[in-house]
């Protein structure tokens, strides 16, 4: 189980990303439209004004049951070992083990 502080920090990052999403998107569009380099640098400075934690690359998917940030499966929202345990216990409908 992940620490509560780490899960809270991740939620805070998600809120910041939602808040500054439009600012980032609009300034990126402006950069692509303007041909002069000096104006692009001005807009680039504006792009760096939001906080670092509002960048979408800082977000991690976390397991719903354990909060683990690694080895997550998007379809289920679970980490690998929890997914395996739930499939073995037949708790996930439609998930089958493959063997060959």
Curated annotation (Swiss-Prot):
GO terms for cellular component: chloroplast; small ribosomal subunit. One of its GO terms (molecular function) is rRNA binding. PROSITE patterns: RIBOSOMAL_S14. Keywords: Chloroplast, Plastid, Ribonucleoprotein, Ribosomal protein, RNA-binding, rRNA-binding. It is found in: Plastid, Chloroplast. GO terms for biological process: translation. Pfam families: Ribosomal_S14 (PF00253). The keyword Iron does not apply. Belongs to the universal ribosomal protein uS14 family. Binds 16S rRNA, required for the assembly of 30S particles. Part of the 30S ribosomal subunit. NCBIfam families: PRK08881.1. This is Small ribosomal subunit protein uS14c. It comes from Nasturtium officinale. The gene is rps14.
């Amino acid at each position: 189980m992940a620490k509560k502080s780490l899960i809270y920090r991740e939620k805070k990052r998600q809120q910041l990303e939602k808040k500054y999403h439009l600012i980032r998107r609009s300034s990126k569009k402006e950069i692509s439209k303007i041909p002069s380099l000096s104006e692009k640098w001005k807009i680039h400075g504006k792009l760096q004004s939001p906080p670092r934690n509002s960048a979408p690359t800082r977000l991690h998917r976390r397991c719903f049951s354990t909060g683990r940030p690694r080895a997550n499966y998007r379809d289920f929202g679970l980490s690998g070992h929890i997914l395996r345990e739930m499939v073995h216990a037949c708790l996930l409908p439609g998930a089958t083990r493959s063997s060959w």
